[in-house]
Amino acid sequence: MFYIYGTSSCGFCDRAKDLLESNNLEYTYQDVTMDQGLIDLFKMNGWKTVPQIFEDEKHIGGFDKLKKYIMEGD
C-alpha cells in the first residue's frame, strides 16, 4: 500500500496518483494542510516539498523517485 501526502494544488501529487492507478497499485492520499500532525511531521523531517510518498513504512520521496521506484521494480 502506498501513501501519498500532498496538497490539493500539487500537480505532482496528481501525477503520482495517476501513476499508481495506471500500475494497479493501491494508495491512499492525505492533504497535509488538513492535519496538524502531518504538518509537524513534515517540519520535523525537513520535508519542504510535496508529495512525500511511502510504500508501507518505507519513505520513497517525491514523484520522480516514485516513478523510478516503480519502473525499477524495487
Model-derived segments and spans:
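Local sequence-structure signature of Cys/Sec-based thiol-disulfide redox active-site neighborhoods
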Residues: 1-25
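Thioredoxin-like thiol-disulfide oxidoreductase module
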Residues: 31-48, 72
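Residue-level recognition of oxygen-bearing side chains
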Residues: 15, 37, 65
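Conserved beta-strand scaffold positions in the cores of enzyme catalytic domains, especially
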Residues: 27-29, 59
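Short alpha-helical
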Residues: 11, 36-37, 61
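Non-catalytic, surface beta->alpha helical segment in thiol-disulfide oxidoreductase systems
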Residues: 55-74
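Structural micro-motif
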Residues: 45-53, 63-64
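Short polybasic/polar patches that bind polyanions
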Residues: 21, 28, 43
